Amino acid sequence: MDAKQIAQFIDHTALTAEKTEQDIIQLCDEAITHQFWSVCINSAYIPLAKQKLAGTPVKICTVVGFPLGANLSTVKAFETTEAIKAGADEIDMVINVGWIKSNKWDAVEKDIATVLAACAGKPLKVILETCLLSKDEIVKACEICKTLNVAFVKTSTGFNRGGATKEDVALMKRTVGDIGVKASGGVRDTETAIAMINAGASRIGASAGIAIIHGLQDVSSTY
């Protein structure tokens, strides 16, 4: 797999609170230069990214209910609607982990379905925060996502105690079948990215996209 092929797996990511407008401009410039699939940014920066990426194939991905997932479902849906109005092409929502831990699976499904409806056809990725879940909980969450026919299930926010693992990616892929799997959190080098792809990931969320395609390790990156 060459650099251009790997680049098309990557959501080039900048989600930490201290990112400036100049950081977002740089992120967009890098995405254009290296032909990444998308930039993944907080929704306040969608208009800026839309301006910078106009006329390019790079998509805009944003996050909803991020990073905890404990917002009201109606709030997540409102975030989604406003993000799409602003120019978002893809939505990454955080599942309600507390509801999973409370065995409130109907509420989990309704939460995802509410956001999916607000997506109005735009691809929805559901972040499971796998480091907080048991294997059985990962499978159950993936089964719900498969039933709802979301576009992707995603491992992690990158803001918790663990990120993507090959084992979790493989488990998710076995469970969801044709639905996409996005590996995110701790994917900082070429070897790890390729391992995730081989395990079943069809998208990689990373702030170290340039290091990944150049075969270099960015040890300062956390997402």
Swiss-Prot record:
Catalytic residue list: 92, 154, 182
Listed EC numbers: 4.1.2.4
Organism: Pasteurella multocida (strain Pm70)
UniProt record similarity statement: Belongs to the DeoC/FbaB aldolase family. DeoC type 1 subfamily.
Gene Ontology molecular functions: deoxyribose-phosphate aldolase activity
Stated name of the protein: Deoxyribose-phosphate aldolase
Listed CDD domains: DeoC (cd00959)
InterPro entries from the UniProt entry: Aldolase_TIM (IPR013785), DeoC (IPR011343), DeoC/FbaB/LacD_aldolase (IPR002915), DeoC_typeI (IPR028581)
